[in-house]
């Protein structure tokens, strides 16, 4: 989550290398390293977050059930299209001047950060549905231009990283947190592909789709598919192939990251 920031802070040479599980390693040139400690201080693994009493005020918060009024958009989106609608309509109606979120790409990891403006408003198809493999969402933060009101969209860890670099970019920030308790590595996708009777090619030239086609949706790898309700049982139910940083994060709702709105699936709404 802070790899981009660590690389920016490093005054010596550093590089990224893609691992087999889809995560990245930072490689520091030991011959040039002066042991300044900036990379260590910027890493959230070395910070303490106070989660005691985290849920105490939840009964006083407001909760809403939302979805897009267009049934086609609602069906094709991850969770009713609420997140994409917030971005698009906020830009169209002048509620924000800029928004930083994700856009779809043609190569792995099939998504990257993008800065949207009132002159550059995305369509619903321009932005990905939920992505259940690691995406370095903050690699394009240099694209964020100064604006009056900026919307940031991401998980709690992504919002924390974005918070550290937008201080001089805007007068006001609206933070939209994507509820997250665990993100997956590419090994999870490989497991799901195997369940479908296919595989993820070594060159990573494939096309995954983790949500959409109704709710909770369908997981697809190329032309193969699996109901999400079944696909989530082992990777999420057993907490397998989880990104290591998720083990130190207790801020699923993004409260410590200053979230104004948190979006999540209403998994148990029928039981209440």
Per-region residue spans from a language model:
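Alpha-helical architecture
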Residues: 2, 35, 155-156
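Residue-level signal for mature regions of secreted extracellular proteins and peptides
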Residues: 4, 26, 36, 239-242
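Single conserved hydrophobic/aromatic residue that forms the stacking wall/gate
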Residues: 1-7, 11
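Short cysteine-rich clusters marking metal-coordination/redox-active sites
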Residues: 4, 33, 246-249
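Iron-sulfur-associated redox domains of electron-transfer enzymes in respiratory
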Residues: 48-272
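N-terminal juxtadomain amphipathic helix
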Residues: 8, 14-73
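Generic structural signal for beta-strand residues in well-ordered domains
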Residues: 2, 18-19, 143, 168
């Amino acid at each position: 989550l802070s790899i981009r920031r660590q690389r920016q802070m490093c005054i010596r040479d550093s590089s990224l290398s893609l691992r087999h599980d889809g995560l990245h390693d930072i490689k520091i040139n030991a011959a040039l390293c002066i042991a300044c400690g900036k990379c260590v201080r910027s890493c959230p693994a070395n910070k303490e977050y106070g989660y005691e009493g985290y849920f105490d005020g939840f009964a006083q918060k407001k909760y809403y059930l939302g979805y897009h009024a267009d049934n086609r958009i609602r069906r094709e989106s991850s969770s009713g299209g609420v997140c994409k609608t917030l971005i698009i309509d906020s830009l169209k109606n002048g509620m924000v001047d800029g928004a930083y979120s994700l856009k779809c790409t043609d190569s792995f990891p099939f998504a990257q950060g993008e800065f949207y403006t009132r002159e550059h408003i995305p369509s619903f198809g321009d932005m990905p549905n939920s992505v259940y493999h690691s995406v370095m969402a903050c690699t394009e933060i240099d694209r964020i231009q100064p604006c009056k009101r900026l919307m940031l969209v991401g998980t709690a860890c992504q919002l924390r990283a974005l918070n550290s670099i937008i201080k001089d970019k805007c007068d006001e920030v609206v933070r939209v947190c994507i509820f997250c308790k665990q993100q997956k590595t590419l090994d999870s996708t490989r497991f799901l592909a195997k369940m479908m009777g296919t595989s993820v090619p070594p060159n990573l030239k494939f096309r995954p789709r983790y949500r959409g086609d109704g709710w909770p949706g369908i997981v697809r790898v190329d032309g193969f598919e699996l109901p999400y309700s079944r696909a989530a049982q082992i990777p999420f139910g057993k907490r397998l192939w989880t990104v290591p940083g998720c083990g130190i994060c207790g801020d699923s709702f993004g409260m410590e990251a200053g979230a104004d709105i948190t979006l999540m699936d209403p998994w148990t709404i029928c039981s209440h």
